[in-house]
A protein has these predicted regions:
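A residue-level detector for the "anchor" residue at the start of short, highly conserved motifs
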Residues: 4, 8-241
Length: 241
C-alpha cells in the first residue's frame, strides 16, 4: 500500500507496508486502495544510436554504464567532425532512467520521455533535445554553455539544477529552477531572454509562444525523481480513476 500526506491540497505518496486505505471513488462508491494498484517507476529505457543500433537498458546499472560508455567510445571514433550525431534515450510508460553525459552532466529521465544527445559535444557548446520530462544537474563550464531544446523553447544553462516538463499533450512547457540560474529563449526571438531564480517556474505557452514566471513548490515539481507520486487538488478516488 501507499502512505499518503496531504499538504495544502498536494498529495505525496510513498510505498511502505500499510493496511489498505478505503477511498471514495466515482459515484460515491468506496473502494480499497492497495499498494499493488500504484507502481513506482522502474529503471528501464531504450537507447537508439545515431547509426540505428537499439540497446535495451534495464535495472543493471553496471551493464547500462558499460553499454553507454562503449557507445560513446565508438561514436568518438566514427565522428571526426564538429557536427554532433545524436543518440536517442527513450523511457516507456512506467520507466525512468538516469544517465551521465560526456561532460559529467547528470540527467534523470521521467516516464514516456526522450532525451536526444551526442556522444561528444561540440567544441563551443553542449546541446540536447528533450521530449517529456527530465531533471538536469549540469556540469559547470563557462566556455561551453549547455542548451536544452524542448518544443519551441531553448534553455541556456549556467551550471545548475532544474526540471523541464514538455510532454506533447501539455499546452505549455514548464521549466523549474532548483539552484543556479537559467535563461529561456523562445524560438524565433533569440534576442530576448527570460531569467529564472531558484524556486521559480517559467510557463511557456506553446500556442501563443509566450511565457510568464511564477513561484512554485519545487518539492512538488521534482517529487517524481524521489519516488513520490504527487497529485494536486485531487482526492484519492480521482487519482485511482
Amino acid at each position: 500500500v501507499v502512505t499518503g500526506l496531504i499538504v495544502g491540497g498536494v498529495g505525496f505518496f510513498r510505498h511502505e507496508p500499510q493496511p489498505p486505505l478505503t477511498v471514495e471513488g466515482i459515484g460515491g462508491q468506496e473502494t480499497a486502495l492497495y499498494a499493488s494498484q500504484i507502481h513506482p517507476g522502474e529503471t528501464k529505457a531504450v537507447l537508439t544510436t545515431d547509426d540505428g543500433q537499439v540497446i535495451d537498458l534495464g535495472a543493471d546499472a553496471v551493464r547500462n554504464e558499460k553499454a553507454i560508455k562503449n557507445r560513446r567510445i565508438k561514436g568518438r571514433q566514427e565522428n571526426s567532425t564538429d557536427v554532433p550525431r545524436f543518440n536517442h534515450l527513450t523511457t516507456p510508460r512506467g520507466g525512468e532512467f538516469e544517465i551521465t553525459l560526456e561532460d559529467g552532466t547528470k540527467v534523470w529521465l521521467n516516464a514516456e520521455s526522450q532525451l536526444s544527445y551526442p556522444d561528444t559535444f561540440r567544441s563551443d557548446e553542449r546541446r540536447v533535445i528533450l521530449k517529456g520530462e527530465a531533471y538536469f544537474q549540469v556540469a559547470h563550464n563557462e566556455e561551453k554553455p549547455f542548451y536544452v531544446e524542448s518544443d519551441g523553447q531553448l534553455v541556456r544553462v549556467y551550471g545548475t539544477e532544474f526540471n523541464i516538463r514538455s510532454y506533447e499533450e501539455d499546452a505549455a512547457v514548464y521549466t523549474t529552477l532548483i539552484s543556479g540560474s537559467v535563461a529561456l529563449q523562445v524560438a524565433g526571438n533569440l534576442n530576448a531572454e527570460l531569467f529564472l531564480t531558484p524556486g521559480r517556474q517559467a510557463v511557456f505557452d506553446k500556442k501563443e509562444a509566450s511565457a510568464f514566471v511564477r513561484s512554485v513548490n519545487t518539492e512538488v515539481v521534482t517529487g517524481w525523481r524521489k519516488g513520490l507520486f504527487v497529485f494536486e487538488e485531487q482526492n484519492l478516488g480521482q487519482i485511482m480513476a
